[in-house]
Amino acid sequence: MAELACFCYPHLENDSYKFIPFNNLAIKCMLTAKVEKKDQDKFYNSIVYGIAPPPQFKKRYNTSDNSRGMNYETIMFNKVAVLICEALNSIKITQSDVANVLSRVVSVRHLENLVLRKENHQDVLFHSKELLLKSVLIAIGQSKEIETTATAEGGEIVFQNAAFTMWKLTYLDHKLMPILDQNFIEYKITLNEDKPISDVCIKELVAELRWQYNRFAVITHGKGHYRVVKYSSVANHADRVFATYKNSAKSGNVIDFNLLDQRIIWQNWYAFTSSMKQGNTLDVCKKLLFQKMKQEKNPFKGLSTDRKMDEVSHVGI
């Protein structure tokens, strides 16, 4: 995750702003600079290489002292920064909005995946600039639309029906901010269209998840898509979701946290997010993740007969 101000800076033209990507030499200069405390939140002028990000964001970059940041000296950083600027420059950002836009925290890996989709000549985003920019505006929170299959970050498609597409995320192969844990495995499920879904399609998805991904929990971060994650990583996801939700509420950005379909979401996660929306503390909410829940009546009778036992997957073993 990183603020948009880590990728670009605004330049006032007439009554709106044009966004310009940083180059990595300017960032490198900023990372070595001594800056007074009062200037930490201001864009840094490297004199030689142009404008650089505010020094308060130093920890967002990978250095000898901080291996958890972005690999800003890669070509991928430049590609992501340019893509963000293209999207922001396609709309009008006024002086009253610019600070809020640049302070927004976005998923670096999501944006790298959109670059990969853009460069894949078999992908619809390669052929449609309009759809590409729409995908980026959704990714950076500038659009209220949810991420659907056409505008998704992408990955490897492992399941699809008339309503849903399930992607295996490819973060291990990333250049900008790769996941280093070689045991990482996670999926995302997007809606093909943002419209009501038939019970038949939901039943097909639940059957797939129950038989092929029975070692995973289905959760949501509230943004209109599902995540399929290892049970061992659920607590970590809970911490992140709770922190994001509370920070947004504190800054006055009211989030419409989408709980999604209770028949698909893991029961304990649904309880956790419902409790969070009611205003309870993190400790109170997290206890619900580890409680034994009363099994609800199966909304899909006969579901277990949809697959033969020899089809049970070993994904996640």
From Swiss-Prot:
Active site (catalytic residues): 225 (for ntpase and rtpase activities)
Gene Ontology molecular function terms on file: ATP binding; metal ion binding; nucleoside diphosphate kinase activity; ribonucleoside triphosphate phosphatase activity; RNA binding
Family membership: Belongs to the rotavirus NSP2 family.
Subcellular location(s) per record: Host cytoplasm
Keywords from the UniProt entry: ATP-binding, Host cytoplasm, Hydrolase, Magnesium, Metal-binding, Nucleotide-binding, RNA-binding
GO biological process: viral genome replication
Residues reported in the UniProt entry to bind ATP: 107-109, 188, 221-223, 227
GO cellular component: host cell cytoplasm
Cofactor section: Mg(2+)
Region of interest (RNA-binding), residue spans: 205-241
Function: Participates in replication and packaging of the viral genome. Plays a crucial role, together with NSP5, in the formation of virus factories (viroplasms), which are large inclusions in the host cytoplasm where replication intermediates are assembled and viral RNA replication takes place. Displays ssRNA binding, NTPase, RNA triphosphatase (RTPase) and ATP-independent helix-unwinding activities. The unwinding activity may prepare and organize plus-strand RNAs for packaging and replication by removing interfering secondary structures.
EC number: 3.6.4.-
Subunit structure: Homooctamer. Interacts with VP1; this interaction is weak. Interacts with NSP5; this interaction leads to up-regulation of NSP5 phosphorylation and formation of viral factories. Interacts with host DCP1A, DCP1B, DDX6, EDC4 and EIF2S1/eIF2-alpha; these interactions are probably part of the sequestration of some host SGs and PBs proteins in viral factories.
Name this protein carries in UniProt: Non-structural protein 2
SUPFAM superfamilies reported in the protein's UniProt record: Rotavirus NSP2 fragment, C-terminal domain, Rotavirus NSP2 fragment, N-terminal domain
Enzyme category, top tier: hydrolase
Pfam families noted in UniProt: Rota_NS35_C, Rota_NS35_N
